Curated annotation (Swiss-Prot):
Disulfide bonds: none annotated. The gene is pdlim7. It holds the Pfam family LIM. GO terms for biological process: actin cytoskeleton organization; atrial ventricular junction remodeling; atrioventricular valve formation; embryonic heart tube morphogenesis; heart development; heart looping; muscle structure development; pectoral fin development. Residues 1-85 form the PDZ domain. This is PDZ and LIM domain protein 7. InterPro entries: PDZ (IPR001478), PDZ-LIM_domain (IPR050604), PDZ_sf (IPR036034), Znf_LIM (IPR001781).
């Protein structure tokens, strides 16, 4: 056990938050740190156990007793802690996970004074702010379609070769390429039937995929021949002579083999622009063959913002597609990419700017109220449910009648006690 002591110079806030206690049957631990706060600068880590507060044994303290002990500190706060084990990069990973895996909301404090404190709990269906985004890694790997017996949607290099017509040549075909059932740029909610079930309608998600262009032709000396001599030896001439898939005529001389069929070289062309495909990649979709340019124009998605065709990285968010450089934070104007973002009045915000502009703090502990935290509104402020206690006896007032004096809540027993 790695025990260490820290002394934080006052005044509050101290820059950390506790969880657990004797009343929870769990040790007091540091649950959250304020970035750049006093505790973080002193080397305190998330998950560290609190051994003592001002030499008072913390193992015998309840959660409220520990809070009161810390609140009583004015000039300095002395803590003895036990270091929790953090794997390499663990703290950063925990921080990222906690900030991106839960929905976060902005809470506007009520200006009216409540005489009955009502608890609220942040849930995906409540709150006025937009939902949080859980980034999802999604990559589509296009299949290469080699010009031999096989099927797929992919670019393919084509080679022109001539061979003597009086020799019998076997067709050399490379290994079959992976089979793809659709174009490589389809959105995930089209190709994945379970997409709508995994992402609730009131949530938004971002997915970055890659739209891959056709491969460049390989050097001539490294290619496998896809043009073969059509004339075979007399013994095989009746069965081995190929037929053109375009004109259905017998091919005499060299020919192209692709997708399990044969073509005259001058008839193996894009079905739209009619450009010959004997040198370059091609795409096959629903039995038709396209060059890379025509395929992009026909099947590549359009950006929901600029309406232009997307090539390269595709940003999937709010069930639409964007260029990465078109989906920006409304405040800092930087690309959000695969990070969490929040919607406010129809505009996306990165996590840092959203918390800066719309975040709400607890009036009791001065810490931010995070998504998932139980909280209540009283006396014109927002409070964590564990922070709304009587200012004198520290009894929890959640759901109970209370009195107020100098903006501080009091229970019935201390309603007329001096502060």
């Amino acid at each position: 056990m790695n025990i260490y002591c820290v002394t934080l110079n006052g005044p509050a806030p101290w820059g950390f938050r506790l969880q657990g206690g004797k009343d929870f049957n769990t040790p007091l631990t540091v649950s959250r740190l304020t970035p750049g706060g006093k505790a973080a600068q002193a080397g305190v880590g998330v998950g560290d156990w609190v051994v003592s507060i001002f030499d008072a044994n913390a193992e015998e303290m309840t959660h409220v007793e520990a809070q009161n002990k810390i609140r009583a500190a004015t000039d300095s706060l002395k803590l003895t802690l036990s270091r929790a084990f953090h794997p390499a990069g663990g703290e950063q990973k925990d921080s990222l996970t906690s900030s991106s895996s839960q929905p976060k909301y902005s809470f506007a404090p009520s200006t009216a004074i409540n005489k009955m404190a009502r608890p609220f709990s942040a849930s995906p269906g409540s709150g006025s702010a937009g939902p949080v985004i859980k980034p999802v890694s999604y990559a589509l790997k296009p299949a290469l379609s080699s010009p031999h017996n096989g099927h797929g949607v992919a670019p393919c290099p084509v080679t022109v070769k001539s061979k003597p017509a009086d020799k019998h040549d076997a067709v050399q075909a490379p290994a079959k390429a992976p089979v793809s059932s659709g174009p490589a740029c389809r959105p995930p909610w089209v190709t994945d039937p379970g997409f709508a079930d995994r992402y609730h309608p009131d949530k938004s998600s971002t997915v970055v995929t890659q739209h891959t262009q056709p491969l460049q032709p390989t050097p001539m000396q490294n290619r496998s021949s896809i043009l073969q001599a059509a004339q075979q030896s007399p013994a095989h001439s009746s069965t081995a002579t190929p037929l053109c898939a375009a004109c259905s005529k017998i091919i005499r001389g060299r020919y192209v083999v692709a997708l399990g069929r044969s073509w005259h070289p001058e008839e193996f062309m894009c079905c739209q622009c009619k450009r010959l495909l004997d040198e370059g990649g091609f795409f096959e979709e629903k039995g038709s063959i396209y060059c890379s340019k025509c395929y992009d124009n026909r099947y590549s998605p359009n950006c929901a913002k600029c309406k232009k065709i997307i090539t390269g990285e595709i940003m999937h968010a709010l069930k639409m597609t964007y260029h990465v450089q078109c989906f920006l934070c409304a405040a800092c104007k930087l690309p959000i990419r695969n990070q969490a973002f929040y919607m406010e009045e129809g505009e996306p915000y990165c996590e840092r700017d959203y918390e800066k502009m719309f975040g709400t703090k607890c009036h009791g502990c001065d810490f931010k109220i995070d998504a998932g935290d139980r909280f209540l509104e009283a006396l014109g402020y927002s409070w964590h449910d564990t922070c709304f206690v009587c200012a004198i006896c520290q009894i929890n007032l959640e759901g109970k009648t209370f009195y107020s004096k100098k903006d501080k809540p009091l229970c019935k027993s201390h309603a007329f006690s001096p502060l």
